[in-house]
């Protein structure tokens, strides 16, 4: 398709799969990641894949990243805001103001700033913004305030951007559930039983939805949950073999 795609956190997991799938669709991809060696090795695998090293919490880094992407691809058609700081810490761990703010900078402020920096190019090209949230935007475990706040925020940012930038730019969000981004290959029967679809998700499950949304012209402002139905299961202690242990 020869589009110009930029992806944050593209060196591993979901972001890496997104990069691969756009490349295989015939696009050019420029990604930013903080893990330099891992990303350099990945970028060597594809001719039309370009890597920029940096921390997206820094707005100057984002500006330079966009300039680099334009230098390499000469256009930007799609922005995928994938990167986040996923450490599960919050009030029970006495997470500091500074640590909370950094998590917001990576997971919420950076997606806004990157969207702002790319706005004119996206409008010109009738582009797309795809934000990656999480089912943590809607349900929580203890001690997860920082991460949950970024994911709830990016859901709201999605529909706000969709209204501001439409009809020229369509903006959507994906909320993944349990996605295996590790080398673990085996899971217990109980793991599978917790998910109505009967499997643990893969980065490909999320990437497929990203590419799908980039092909549509009548979906915008939406957050689409991709979690195998896990968040839809109603659980009561002692019901249907579910037990809460204290």
Segments (PLM) and residue ranges:
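Canonical Rossmann dinucleotide-binding motif of NAD(H)/NADP(H)-dependent dehydrogenases/reductases
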Residues: 1-30
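Short C-terminal tail/terminal secondary-structure segment
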Residues: 89, 220-246
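Substrate-binding pocket helix/loop in short-chain dehydrogenase/reductase
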Residues: 90-92, 96-101, 191
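Active-site helix of classical SDR
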Residues: 115, 150, 158
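Alpha-helical segment proximal to the catalytic Tyr-Lys
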Residues: 120, 162-167
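Residue(s) in the substrate-gating loop at a strand-loop-helix junction
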Residues: 134
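C-terminal substrate-recognition "lid" of short-chain dehydrogenase/reductases
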Residues: 202-226, 231
């Amino acid at each position: 398709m020869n589009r110009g795609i930029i992806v944050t956190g593209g060196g591993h997991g979901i972001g890496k799969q997104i990069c691969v799938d756009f490349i295989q669709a015939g696009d050019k991809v420029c990604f930013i990641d903080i893990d330099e060696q891992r990303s350099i090795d990945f970028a060597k695998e594809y001719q039309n894949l370009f890597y920029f090293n940096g921390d997206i919490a820094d707005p100057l880094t984002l500006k330079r990243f966009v300039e680099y992407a334009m230098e390499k691809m000469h256009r930007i058609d799609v922005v995928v805001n994938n990167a986040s700081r996923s450490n599960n810490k919050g009030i029970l761990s006495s997470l500091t103001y500074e640590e909370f703010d950094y998590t917001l900078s990576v997971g919420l402020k950076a997606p806004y700033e990157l969207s702002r920096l790319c706005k004119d190019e996206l409008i010109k090209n009738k582009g797309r913004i795809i934000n990656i949230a999480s089912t943590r935007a809607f349900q929580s475990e203890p001690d997860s305030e920082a991460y949950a706040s970024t994911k709830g925020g990016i859901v709201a940012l999605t529909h706000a951007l969709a209204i501001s930038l439409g009809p020229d730019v369509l903006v959507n969000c994906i909320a993944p559930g349990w996605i295996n981004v590790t080398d673990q290959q085996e899971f217990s029967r109980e793991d599978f039983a917790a998910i109505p679809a009967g499997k643990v998700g893969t980065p490909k499950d999320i990437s497929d939805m990203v590419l799908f949304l980039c092909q549509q012209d009548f979906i915008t402002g939406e957050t689409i949950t991709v979690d195998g139905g896990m968040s839809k299961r109603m659980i009561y202690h002692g019901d249907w073999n579910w037990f809460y242990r204290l």
